Every structure is written in structure tokens, then in C-alpha cells.
Amino acid sequence: MTDSTRSLRNCLAPAKLNLFLHITGRRPNGYHDLQSVFQLLNWGDTLHFTLRDDGKVARATDVPGVPEQSDLVVRAANLLKAHTGTAAGVDIEIDKCLPMGAGLGGGSSDAATTLLALNRLWQLDLPRAELQSLAVKLGADVPFFVFGKNAFAEGIGEELAEVELPTRWFLVVTPRVHVPTAEIFSDELLTRDSKPVTITDFLAQQSSDARWPDSFGRNDMQQVVTSKYAEVAQVVKWLYNVAPARMTGSGASVFAAFQSKQQAEAAKAQLPAGWNGAVAESLNEHPLFAFAS
């Protein structure tokens, strides 16, 4: 990343994985209570921010299928601008890397990187807690990325507690299918009564188990998604023959963990022709963590 008084270049918006995802209840307003552990990855979209003197917020990159004013990046910048009353503006360029509808948090991460970067570029110096309260208005996953640490999440995903996770390498395989999150959450067959667990439960079973993530929990959405989307089921089955595999979020991406980059790359090399896979290292902290206190 490069930093100047007029611009911030090469700001990573990291992907996340749900190492497990349990749905423990449903609220009267339709939202679901969940428990999960969010893992940051050193892989994601890259954003570039340049100051404007006319006060306007503009997206300088076309993102197919995402109109500018509904883009979470633009919405995040306008929300921060309205909240603080700053006269500053910004041009935002986005180098998209993460697929949409994949369970990797791409749009949410872009929004969080925007909040953190503009907190620095616009010299706002808002505390992290204040940025997180804004992030809630943009989506359930955005507060986690502003939080900036690997986390045990509860509630609708906004109750976060830092967890220390070992360094791992991941192979993430994304089938060519878009899984609408709302469709999965509304499915009658979705498990909504998983027994609550604790951070201690998770940490006790994940630290050194060779069968991890199999050794702890599951993704409650996986069975519904694989029953509806054969492409996801095919990836889960194939990857599971290489290493314990699990879907992240509401899909469609599926991941497996490895102890080394070499192991992950070797698994990637075996992918069937035409499949989309990426090897990524775990992160302990968001690259822009220092941009809020």
C-alpha cells in the first residue's frame, strides 16, 4: 500500500472464511441468530482512493452488474461523509478479484476498507467503535471487517470477540454459480436450532487437529445449498477427497486448509480443467487496522 496526503493506493479488502457457521435461532424480524468464526485472508479486492476538492464521491471503475449509487463502496463513502459533515470528496477505483455471491464477503470487505481508508485520507480520526456503528448500516458482515481481527461472531454477526488462530494456507474453490443468500436463509429445510457453542469449545478442538475443520461444527447452510446447486455439491465432494472441505457463508465458495503453501498449491494443481481456485494465507489483522483506534 502507498500512502500520501492526496491518495491511498493498493488498499487490500481481504476475503473472509466462515470456519464454521451455526444458526441458533430466528428473530421475529426475520433475521437469524448465528455463531461463526471469521478468518481473514491475505487475498481480496484492491481499492485506490484519490482526494477530490469538489466534495463529490465517485467510483472511477465500472463494476458489471453493480450500479454506482448502489455499490457498497459508494454508499460507505457517502455514509461517512454525511455522518461527519466533511467537505472532502474522493475518487474510488476498484480492482475486483473476489467473485460475488461466493460467501467470501467481497462487497462487505470493500465497504469496510472504504470506511477505514477514508478515515485516514479525510483525516477524520474516528474511533473504531464509531466506524463499526456506521458499518452495521451497510450490512451484517461489514462490522467484522472494520473490527479488523479474526473473530468469534454471534447475534446476526455484529457481536465480535477476537480469537487467535494459527497460520494456515487455504485453497478456495468457487464454482461458476451465484447463490442468493436470502434464498438459503428462507429455505424451509434450513437448520435454525443448532445448540450454542463457546469460544473455548472452538479453540479446544481446532488448534492442532489434522482433520480440521471437520473436527468442529459445520456450516448449517451447506446441506441446503448443495441440495439446490449441483455445482457446489460437486466441488465439496471433489475437494473432500483431497482434504477436509467446507463451504463458507451461504456459498458458493468451498475451502480446505493446509499447513503449507506447497500443500495448498499441490491440491490446486489437481483441480479439474475450468475450475476456479485460489491459494491464500491466513491473516491475523486487517491491513488497514491502524487506520482506526
Swiss-Prot record:
The keyword Kinase applies. One of its GO terms (biological process) is isopentenyl diphosphate biosynthetic process, methylerythritol 4-phosphate pathway. Catalyzes the phosphorylation of the position 2 hydroxy group of 4-diphosphocytidyl-2C-methyl-D-erythritol. Keywords: ATP-binding, Isoprene biosynthesis, Kinase, Nucleotide-binding, Transferase. This is 4-diphosphocytidyl-2-C-methyl-D-erythritol kinase. The active site is at K16, D141. Belongs to the GHMP kinase family. IspE subfamily. The keyword Manganese does not apply. GO terms for molecular function: 4-(cytidine 5'-diphospho)-2-C-methyl-D-erythritol kinase activity; ATP binding. The lineage of its organism: Bacteria, Pseudomonadati, Pseudomonadota, Betaproteobacteria, Burkholderiales.
